[in-house]
Structures are given as C-alpha cells and as structure tokens.
C-alpha cells in the first residue's frame, strides 16, 4: 500500500502531523484514562466516564470513544470497556484481544464485531452485570485456550 502512495505528490510529514494532532483537552483526558481505569477481574478492565468527567476535560462522548483502544497494550488484558454516561443511558464501548464479545453486546441492546462492539445499559448497576458477564466470558476463553 505504501508503494502505491509514494506515486502521488503529497507531503507525507504534513499528512502524519495532521493525523496525529489532538487537542490539549483530549490529551489530558487520555492521561485520565490511564490514571482512572480499573481492573475488574483477571483479564478484564473498565473505565466509567461520567458527565462530570467529560465536562472537566472538555470532551464529548465521540472524543471519549477515540481512546478506547489505549488500554489494548496492558499485559494480561483480554477484554475491556469504556462506559460513557449519556444522561438517560450508559453507552458501553467493548473491545477484546481474543474472546468474542459481540454476543455479549447483543445481550445488552448492542452488537458489532467479534472483537469490537458496543452496548447500552440503563445505569451503573446494569454495567456491573455486563462486567460480570464479560469476566465469565474471559474466564471461559482463558480455560479453553489454556492461558494462565
């Protein structure tokens, strides 16, 4: 693909700069992600993002969602989610490095791809149910694949 791109006259450095530039608010929010995520059980992590958090950092739910893959590099993590308070519901962005999670998302009014899905829960208590289900799913995946 890169060999095809170099046939065109464009400034690669300028393109990369534009792709990598984020606002200071979003940069500070990403630091918040690393500071505030929580490990639920072995192999499962999550982050609850309240309206107050978004207001504090000046970000919206769309910007928040851009950070969901930041937790991917955490050693021993197999599935994780961001739970974003949208007032009358909580949107959950679910990601996985192995366990199929779209069936989990479907159980909670969502869907998506096997390793990247979204769901909606009514409140934080229902998020706990989703996290319990996610932990069971990861546990099964680890046993089936003989991962310790």
Short names for language-model regions:
Residues 1-107, 112-148:
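Hydrophobic helix-and-loop "lid/oligomerization" segment in the mid-to-C-terminal part
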């Amino acid at each position: 693909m890169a060999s095809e791109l170099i046939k065109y006259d464009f400034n690669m450095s300028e393109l990369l700069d534009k792709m990598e530039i984020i606002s200071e608010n979003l940069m500070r929010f990403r630091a918040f992600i690393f500071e505030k995520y929580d490990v639920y059980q072995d192999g499962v992590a999550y982050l609850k993002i309240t309206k107050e958090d978004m207001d504090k950092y000046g970000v919206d739910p769309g910007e928040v969602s851009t950070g969901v893959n930041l937790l991917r590099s955490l050693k021993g993590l197999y599935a994780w989610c961001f739970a974003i308070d949208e007032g009358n519901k909580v949107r959950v962005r679910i990601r996985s490095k192995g366990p199929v999670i779209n069936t989990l998302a479907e159980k909670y009014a969502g869907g998506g791809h096997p390793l990247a899905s979204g769901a909606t829960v009514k409140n934080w208590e229902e998020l706990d149910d989703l996290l319990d289900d996610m932990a069971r799913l990861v546990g099964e995946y680890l046993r089936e694949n003989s991962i310790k």
